[in-house]
Amino acid sequence: DWNDPRIDINNYGKGGVNRWGIAQGPGGFAGINSGYNPGEPANRQSYFYSNTTPANNLQTDPMTGQIMNYAELNFILAEAALIGWISGSAENYYNKGAEASIKLWLPDWPKLGENIVTWLTNADIQWFNSYAIDEKMELIHKQKYYALFCNDLQQWFEYRRTGHPVLPKGPGLRNGGVMPARMTYPIYVQSTNPTNYKQAVQAQGNDVISTQVWWQKP
């Protein structure tokens, strides 16, 4: 868990609940396995506290209604600097993004005298200039994935666009073991607008979840 302050109860929690309102399971902070087989019982470990919990539950937290935050902006700039689209330090933008991601939820962080570089180093997710571009992209997009907490559609978009971060693929994934690339057209679109539907399918490819959109990373 990288000693993440957002799930730190002792220093940043309230009423025995951490800022993200996540309960620790017997194996630590771990959710349901991704892509488990249909019909199998879900192996739930960590879970969100319910809205009956008086402190730090996300069901009634206005922070879950984010559209775009400062952390996401900095990770966009980090990627742009990394691939040479803009000037500036990709490392600096990465650090600023990670810091903004924490401070979004905990404006008073840090309380313990550490800074973002120290925290990233202690968590073993610090920036190394010696890393290959793909390794740096993984660093950026793993932290961006967490910064997009509660914005799951954007997380899905970023994964399809870049292939990062590396996500687990369980046996229940189906679709040939490939992450879904798109949604299919609803039946009502096919039935009420058949001409344009057929034209769209002809231009875009088969109307199945494995057909990649035009901007997607192969």
Model-derived regions: residue spans:
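Residue-level recognition of short, well-ordered coil/turn positions
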Residues: 85-86, 164
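Hydrophobic-face positions in mid-chain alpha helices that act as interaction patches
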Residues: 1-77, 82-83, 90-130, 135-143, ...
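C-terminal functional modules
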Residues: 102-106, 110-218
